[in-house]
Amino acid sequence: GRVKVVYSASHLLHNPEVEIERSSAHSPFEHTGRAEKIRETLAADDAFEFVSPKAWGTEPITAIHNEGLLRFLSTAWADYQRDVKESREVVPDMFFKSNLREKMGDRVEPESVNGKLGWWCFETTTPLTVGTYEAARGAVDVAMSATQIVLDGAKNSYGLCRPPGHHATSDLYGGYCFFNNAAIAAHHVAKSTGTKVTVLDVDYHHGNGTQQIFYERNDVQFVSLHGDPARAYPYFTGYAEVTGSGKGRGSTLNLPLPARTDDDSYMSALEQACESIK
């Protein structure tokens, strides 16, 4: 049979015109055209059949993410227009760092939307727009629906998720990611079937969010090939010596690749990644 591709046009609602990256404002690298190019290519191939996602609600999201992050993203853009100024894109001015409040008692989410932006977001390239929350919810529905197709008996499926997800941690958004689509789907499989799940991440950047979410769990393995964080985003995570902790010790495998890695070296690393999946 044909491979089912789950796609939602809701991703078009997240359409920022600018991002702040490398000390400059420019048009976003993560834009609607990325997903549309994939859609057009697959739609022209008879091997694929397009289906729409089902609505899964917020429960799969809050199984993985802090409810405060969900609540914030649902109103943040509108709150900013009301409380700060009218702005097509909304980004933080300041980020919370734990040592700002070292020895000063419990951390508390700020009341102002400017404070909340820096509380829930970790970098500047991920603007909120009027439709971002709806698009992010749609991407979760796509991931969950594609996963359910396999749970219902299909050999495979493809979830065309946008916005992406693997940089979103349990309580932070950033790196173009709002909710961690793959982590939400992997958790759903692990909990509904009782079987071990592996997330194999082959994006150029390390999936810091997916790693963080499953770092102390042994029911979801995280395996990642990525550019060496000594020189590549997200810089702070993705090192080979990081392998999980507690029950999750040994369930994380990072394979950082040096600059100018050729095809043979990449395939060798991919083979190592696949052999680790059990």
Locate each region found by the language model.
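HDAC/HDAC-like amidohydrolase catalytic core signature
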Residues: G1-L200, Y204-K278
